[in-house]
């Protein structure tokens, strides 16, 4: 972006510039989806019925479902298969006004399969006019084969630290490392070790933090200077204060809690009132948030998190960029920023969160190149 101003001023300054008629629509910065799990094989629609019958997320996981189901499926697929499945998903994401997308690995949980997932993300970046931000999530779960003798969880953690992270860093396959810090998954101490190794290898860090139970993960994110702490539906008051006193962005995922049928959403207003920076994201994944519709997440941010439309828009642009370490590059319509734009067929910004479930995106651009039209 070289200039922002009134039509008359810009027409005088740039008389030969190519013009695009927005036909009275609303132009926003391209939406920044800072938390997705777009590299997977089959959907997990059967789990929705299991939850409706009364099973919890952790009970389904304990039966070999959840993340473990996606792991079995991804391991059986080739890189080419995963690429072919992910490509139309990312195009659908762009069709809803998103121009920057964080994409995680995490359904491999083995060296070759995690590398395979990250290489798919690299191929997707070459094939799509979007900005993809790759994240290594080898610590998404403890794989089933390390939950019983002769193998142990400590051996898997050693594999992540000693083999996965060095390979990911050496091949420059990821910008971030992430971990699921949650009771029953990774402890705070285990998370500190793994994230410390990732940082030492040159990766920035993120956390899945305090999603289902307060575990001190938000406090750990603040302690380590993580770029973001995500989920936070069960964050403690102490965790809120810790994030508010830090530079870590609190990324909230209201679509996940809605789809899981959980009444308790992240305490967005308390986080804002304490001074934390709030981002929102889709958490697009096959089990707990199968949506690419970012404007729907804005609707949920307003109706469920009690954000204003202005706050939700900020959370999906400026703060979404900050949650990816891109605050100086994208998320704003200002000189010097990348020309990442989304055009919506609405007459008022407040309509962006009003027509819930309806896609009003007419076109989107990343760095001036069309993502969707």
Q: Model-found features: residue ranges?
A:
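Histidine-rich, glycine-flanked metal-binding segment
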Residues: 1-27
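Conserved beta-strand scaffold positions in the cores of enzyme catalytic domains, especially
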Residues: 17-21, 134, 364
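Divalent metal-coordination and catalytic microenvironments
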Residues: 24, 35, 48, 97, ...
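Di-metal (Zn2+ and/or Mg2+/Mn2+) metal-binding site signature of metallo-dependent hydrolases
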Residues: 25-47
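Flexible glycine-/small-residue-enriched beta->alpha junction loops
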Residues: 43-69
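Metal-coordinating catalytic core of metallo-dependent amide/deamination hydrolases
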Residues: 68-85, 91, 99-215
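Non-catalytic positions within long, well-ordered alpha-helices that form the structural scaffold/packing
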Residues: 94, 161, 169-170, 199, ...
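Active-site-adjacent C-terminal substructures of enzyme catalytic domains
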Residues: 204-205, 213-332, 344-350, 356-358, ...
């Amino acid at each position: 972006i070289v200039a922002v101003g009134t039509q008359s001023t810009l027409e005088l300054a740039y008389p030969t510039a190519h013009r695009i008629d927005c036909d009275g629509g609303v132009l926003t910065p391209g939406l920044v989806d800072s938390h997705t799990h777009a590299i997977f094989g089959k959907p997990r629609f059967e789990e929705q019925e299991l939850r409706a019958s009364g099973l919890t997320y952790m009970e389904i996981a304990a039966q070999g479902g959840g993340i473990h189901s996606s792991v079995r499926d991804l391991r059986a697929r080739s890189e080419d298969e995963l690429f072919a499945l992910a490509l139309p998903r990312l195009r659908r994401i762009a069709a809803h006004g998103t121009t920057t997308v964080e994409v995680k690995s995490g359904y491999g949980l083995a060296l070759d399969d995690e590398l395979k997932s990250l290489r798919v993300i690299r191929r997707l970046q070459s094939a799509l006019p979007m900005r993809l931000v790759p994240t290594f999530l080898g610590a998404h779960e403890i794989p089933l084969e390390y939950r019983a003798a002769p193998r142990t969880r400590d051996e898997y953690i050693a594999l992540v630290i000693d083999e996965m992270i060095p390979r990911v860093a050496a091949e420059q396959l990821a910008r971030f490392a992430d971990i699921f810090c949650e009771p029953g998954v990774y402890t705070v101490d285990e998370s500190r070790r793994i994230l410390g190794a990732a940082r030492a290898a040159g990766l920035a860090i993120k956390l899945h933090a305090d999603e289902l139970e307060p575990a001190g993960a938000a406090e750990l994110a603040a302690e380590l200077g993580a770029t973001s702490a995500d989920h936070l539906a069960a964050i403690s008051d102490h965790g809120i204060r810790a994030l508010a006193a830090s530079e870590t962005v609190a990324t909230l995922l209201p679509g996940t809690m809605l789809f899981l049928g959980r009444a308790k959403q992240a305490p967005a207003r308390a986080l804002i009132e304490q001074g934390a920076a709030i981002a929102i994201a889709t958490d697009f994944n096959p089990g707990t948030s199968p949506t690419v519709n970012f404007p729907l997440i804005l609707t949920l941010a307003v109706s469920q998190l009690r954000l204003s439309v202005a706050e939700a828009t900020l959370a999906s642009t400026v703060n979404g960029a900050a949650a990816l370490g891109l605050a100086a590059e994208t998320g704003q319509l200002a000189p010097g920023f990348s020309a990442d734009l989304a055009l919506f067929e609405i007459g008022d910004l407040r309509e962006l969160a009003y027509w819930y479930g309806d896609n009003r995106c007419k076109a989107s651009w990343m760095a001036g190149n069309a993502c969707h039209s």
